[in-house]
Each structure stands twice: as C-alpha cells, then as structure tokens.
C-alpha cells in the first residue's frame, strides 16, 4: 500500500481506538444488508431475512469480529499484505469461491462504519488513507484469483 509516513501513522493511531469486535459485526452486517447477494456465502448463519435479523444475528457478529481481527493484521503489516493474506486468498478463491469484488465492497462498508464511529475525527485525509488500505487488503485477498 502506497502510504506516506504520516498516513501510516494516522491509520495506525485510529486503528488503536477501533473496537474490532463491535465494528466487525457492524461492517459485515451492513455488507449483508446493503449488498444482499453477499448473503449466499453465509447460508449457515440462519435468519438473514430482514435488516434487523441480519444486524442482530450472533453468527454475523462473530464472523465480523473474525474478519476485522484479520483486517487488523493487515493494518499492522501494510508492507506485506500479499504475504499476510496469502492463505485467506487461497481459501476464499479455491474453497469458498467468493467473488473478489466482495472484498472491495466490504472495505468500502468498513470505511462507512469507521466514519460513523469516529465522526469528525475521521477526516477526509484519514478516509483517503483508509481507502488505500482497504483497496490494498482487497487486492491482497484477490491475489490468488489472478
């Protein structure tokens, strides 16, 4: 990811304040509501029939937590995203057959959730840096597909 030293510092500083457990569930839940076709990858999660059901679903929250912890690994390894996500890229490509576009969608949803949580602190400059990070993570996760 092509970030300046200042952008890296800002990304890491904000990430230190992120409640990964809470934000992960919100981000995955929002993805499943805003882009309902992504629900097909989560058949085992039970009731996803309404936004309230999705957002209140314990399995969505638990998997969102797992996803965000993994994203945090990337935030702390910005210079080696492909290496950080090599195994997950292979899993999502070969076994789960997830459309890599979904990684981009989730990244964009995560930026929205961060903006909600941090309000004025999530400046346009910080958003721009996070957009670079989520794009880098999405590209790393899609690496096996190429």
UniProtKB/Swiss-Prot annotation:
Modified residues (Phosphoserine): 44
Keywords: Acetylation, Heme, Iron, Metal-binding, Oxygen transport, Phosphoprotein, S-nitrosylation, Transport
Ion transport found in the keyword field: no
Signal peptide: none
InterPro entries hit by this protein: Globin (IPR000971), Globin-like_sf (IPR009050), Globin/Proto (IPR012292), Hemoglobin_b (IPR002337), Hemoglobin_oxygen_transport (IPR050056)
GO cellular component terms attached to this protein's record: blood microparticle; haptoglobin-hemoglobin complex; hemoglobin complex
Alphabetical GO biological process terms: hydrogen peroxide catabolic process
CDD domains recorded: Hb-beta-like
Globin domain sequence ranges: 2-146
UniProt entry tagged with the keyword Heme: yes
Chain positions with N-acetylvaline modification: 1
Tissues showing expression: Red blood cells.
Residues the record lists as S-nitrosocysteine modifications: 93
Domain of life: Eukaryota
Gene Ontology molecular function, alphabetical: haptoglobin binding; heme binding; hemoglobin alpha binding; metal ion binding; organic acid binding; oxygen binding; oxygen carrier activity; peroxidase activity
Family: Belongs to the globin family.
Function: Involved in oxygen transport from the lung to the various peripheral tissues.
Annotated protein name in UniProt: Hemoglobin subunit beta
Gene behind the chain: HBB
